[in-house]
């Protein structure tokens, strides 16, 4: 299969971010920028301005624009190390996670200091930094954690460096995506994920074509949303198909999303274990060890019990049960379907059953009982676990909806056949209509038997 490559047509989203950068920082051509007909558009050394946006965006170039630019005073190792020091000075959870593996090989700070970034990657990191301090901080956090996880896997120093570089650059593909799909608080519909799931592949192409890194770096960038059980994206790779550095970056990216919240290690531990097989057990033990290392009597302020949350848990249970029934009914119906759709439904049902087991194993099923009394003596611990488990399970149902939508996007009949199931899993209008028909939650015995 031919490897996709970067286009010499300029991506408009990248170009717009670049033009915004020219208004606050000197961005210059490191060589002549020439179109495919040989016309010089920007001379070597010339400073880019907003006035050149239309010219650059309207021509197909002889070389990619990314390889022909440099920024004066952009992101570099000094900024990265300063950001890393700030993270390590303020984040107790990250220190505890890294501290569990501190004696294995080169320190994360030394690896960060030894990273090389050419003009193109420095530009990517500079644009990332311009998205706000949290954006670069996220990249550095993922890099630090990826190195820590690579140490947990006992990877070589070179593989630890690959994991760290991939962690630093894992989201550069998002620079090429319409910002509307990345807006804070934006809830993507299942079919809209098509705009986002490509960013690991874009990142892989950028790293491959713009830097002389080992191939393991680009590969790990492409794998940072994959999961060990094959439920990730973009390739749904599983098991040994995912590289060691890729596994390290994958779990690091997930951890970075919860470590800035309250009770971060508790959240991380539950997220890692809620669906067995999503991540290597090594990573769960690393988080559990960091959690055990916390002071036993540390001050806590857990959330107050809220009986209104029981309604949300009941709705979530209905959603799981109705999704299972919908998929099973499709297999029973005497309608024509392709082998691909049949396999897709079977795979979906297996994933929903795993989520059903997670619902029960986390104890959420106890809240379905009338007068369960769980709130009476709760100091907030149960409330916290309930909230985290509900969130994690909801996200995984939406993951399945996303995968169904993307796998049927090119076949209208398949998409129409699965539209109702996709809506149930995503929590959309189809779910709301189904739930209005319910007076009592589905019974638990069969599900509990399946989970046993």
Stretches found by the model and what they are:
Residues 184-205, 230-304:
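Divalent-cation-assisted or electrostatically stabilized phosphate/pyrophosphate-binding catalytic cores
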